[in-house]
Amino acid sequence: MTELQQIIEAAFERRDSITPGSVDAATKSAILQTIDLLDAGKARVAEKIAGEWVVHQWLKKAVLLYFRINDNGIIKGDDAQYYDKVPLKFSDYTAEQFKEAGVRVVPPATARKGSFIAPNTVLMPSYVNIGAFVDEGTMVDTWATVGSCAQIGKNVHLSGGVGIGGVLEPLQANPTIIEDNCFIGARSEVVEGVIVEEGSVISMGVFIGQSTRIYDRETGEIHYGRVPAGSVVVSGSLPSKCGKYSLYAAVIVKKVDAKTRAKVGINALLRSIDE
C-alpha cells in the first residue's frame, strides 16, 4: 500500500468530519494528487491484471473525498453559468494543450476534472463524469454519457444517446466496463457494473444491468453481468416458466471474431441476425 493510498484510506474512515474548512493540509494534498493521477490516466479505478478486472476501491474513496473538500462554486460556460463542486477538465486548456492531448472536443461536450480522455478520442456533445477512463481511438457520440469511474476501452464507439452507468456508491460496487473494440448502439444502456467483453456489438436500444438475462441462442446459456467476447446482442424476450408472459432479455444472436469484424461492417452483422 502506497503512502498516498494510506492517507486516503485513513481519511475515508473519518470522512463525515471532513469539510472544506476542516481538512488538514496532508489529506487535502493526497486527495488532490490522486485526482490529478486519475485526470492524467496515470491511475485508473479498474484495470485488467492477468486477464481479470481489478477494482482499486481507494481511488473511488478519493473521488468521494474530493466532493467533501470542495465548496460549490461558479463554473463559467459559453452561454450559461453552473454551480458545482467539481471543475471541468478542459476549462483552462489552450490550443497547444488540446493538440498535445490529441483529443477533439465538440461543443458543448463536458468532461469533469478527474476523468481521463486518451489521445485520438472524439467527444461529440456528450458527458464524461469524474473517475471515468476513455481509452485511445474511441468515439463518444452525441448525448452519450460515460458515468463516474466507468472504463471504456480502445477503439470503442458509443453511439448517440448511449448511457454507460456510473458507480461511486455503494462503494463495493464495480464500475461498468466496455472492453476494446466494442460497438454500443444508439440509446442503449449498460449499467450496474456490467462488463461488455472485447469485440462485442450491442444493437440499438439494448438495456443491460446486473439482473438482465443475457441469453445465448446458440448454446442456451444465460449470462448475468457479462457479455462474452465477440457477442452480437439485440433486444429480445424470454418466456416465463408458466408460459403466460414474456420478460425482457438481451439476446446473443451470434459470435464474431476479429477477422469477421474486419471484413464485415457493423450494420451487416446486425442485419443478418436470422442467418
From Swiss-Prot:
Subcellular location: Cytoplasm
A Gene Ontology term for the protein's cellular component: cytoplasm
Transmembrane segments annotated in the record for this chain: none
A single GO BP: lysine biosynthetic process via diaminopimelate
Gene3D superfamilies for this protein: Hexapeptide repeat proteins, Tetrahydrodipicolinate-N-succinyltransferase, N-terminal domain
InterPro entries: DapD_Trfase_Hexpep_rpt_fam, Hexapep, Hexapep_transf_CS, THP_succinylTrfase_dom1, THP_succinylTrfase_N_sf, Trimer_LpxA-like_sf
EC numbers: 2.3.1.117
Main location: cytoplasm
Reaction catalysed by this enzyme: (S)-2,3,4,5-tetrahydrodipicolinate + succinyl-CoA + H2O = (S)-2-succinylamino-6-oxoheptanedioate + CoA
Superkingdom as given in the UniProt entry: Bacteria
UniProt record similarity statement: Belongs to the transferase hexapeptide repeat family.
Listed name of the protein: 2,3,4,5-tetrahydropyridine-2,6-dicarboxylate N-succinyltransferase
Gene that encodes it: dapD
